[in-house]
Amino acid sequence: MFPSSDFSFSPSSLFSAYASLTGFLMLFRSMLHDFVPEKLRSYFSSLLDRFFTPKSKYLTVIIDENFGLNRNQVFDAAEMYLRSKIGPETERLRVGKIPKQKHFTISIERGEEILDTFEESEVKWSYVQSENEKGDKVKRYYELTFEKKLRDKVLNSYLTHVVAESEEIKRNLRVVKLYSRDVYASDDDDGMAGGNWGCINLEHPSTFDTLAMDPNAKKKIIDDLERFLKRKEFYKRVGKAWKRGYLLYGPPGTGKSSLIAAMANYLKFDVFDLELSSIYDNGELKRVLLSTTNRSILVIEDIDCNAEVRDREAENQEDEQIKGKVTLSGILNFIDGLWSSFGDERIIVFTTNHKERLDPALLRPGRMDVHINMSYCTGLGFRTLVSNYLGLDGLNHPLCEEIEALVDSTEVTPAELAEELMQDDDTDVVLRGVISFVEKRKVERSKTKKEVSICKATDDDEKQNGSLGCVKKKKKGGKQKGKGKGKGKAKTYLI
């Protein structure tokens, strides 16, 4: 049906066909270069490339080290973020350390890749470092590769997540500083604070885990701090300065300073310790407070020792002794007045041993937001001390239950109990010593209260009878002149 063909594919015929085709292509190329403009040739070439090259489903974003003349914030955030994503599959790392750092800085070397997952979507990071032809400039950048369908999620949500995580990592690595106007600036000073503030590293070991406080009270403080950190937009919406005021009150040795250190270590906030006695007047107070930094805790200890805060009427006196001093109105102006809006993310802490001595204006809501009673140690607080100092669970030792009952019924401070727990290395000896100490303290407290009660009752009776009080002190000059018996009465003092 199909006649056979005499045509055969011999090597000579194939070579002849190849030569003819090659000659035609060379002639076509020559004509193309001679008669078709270069721009038109490039246009058709790009069309052919796009038509025949398969489209990739991946998109790559370049994150350069510099953005214009400034550092690229996204590059720095990615560098910090990827340090926490280094896994065992990474083959090459870079390690460095500067004198002020406590830990080594570890990052990936060029050519290394890191896979990351965000909301069930996978992305790939690559670190690239290249030099120019002269070798005097190094270009560093990250390549972020992901599927094109994830473009909006990565460029909006994921990169925002990377920046936020990097800020959190930096806060955790940051060394908390303690500022005071009595300390000279050191090499560790970052220069952020002015106003003659000097600083040292706050290496106080106190944390909320080591505080001898009721667990529920500690949880309330932590929850309040967390809410404060997350409410930037809330404070802005309600028209309030982004700050929080705490009043710590209670007898000495109950852990007020330790709580402040625990708050600073938890928040990674610097601490500015201000002594009002070192401030000349309200103008200097304003300058000093304006020189503090954001994300800091301003501490004014023993606020009850300042006469102007105890007695508001002292502001209205005109004598020279009062002039040139810090007044209560000057302090209140920085708590909730016009000057309270300076800075963001600030915490103000006042401490006092005698809350009742403070002017009521200082205690009103909106000025001191949280009042924390740092009272005597409780049984639960003693458990924390036993765990910290003896390294054991108080519930596992037979003497601890007896001590907890004694502590709950006695006025004894955590500092006093901590001192007793360091008296010996033997646990049984220490705990028996604590029992003896608490029992002795209980007897002393009971005796003191009884004496005060008797003295007060006696004084009340004698006052009603018009006679002397508990302790009598005669006026100088011996006998008093005059006929009346009431003249020259001794002054009465209560112990």
Curated annotation (Swiss-Prot):
GO terms for molecular function: ATP binding; ATP hydrolysis activity. It comes from the Eukaryota. Its cofactor is Mg(2+). One of its GO terms (biological process) is response to stress. One of its GO terms (cellular component) is membrane. It is found in: Membrane. Residues 471-495 have a biased composition (Basic residues). This is AAA-ATPase At2g18193. It comes from Arabidopsis thaliana.
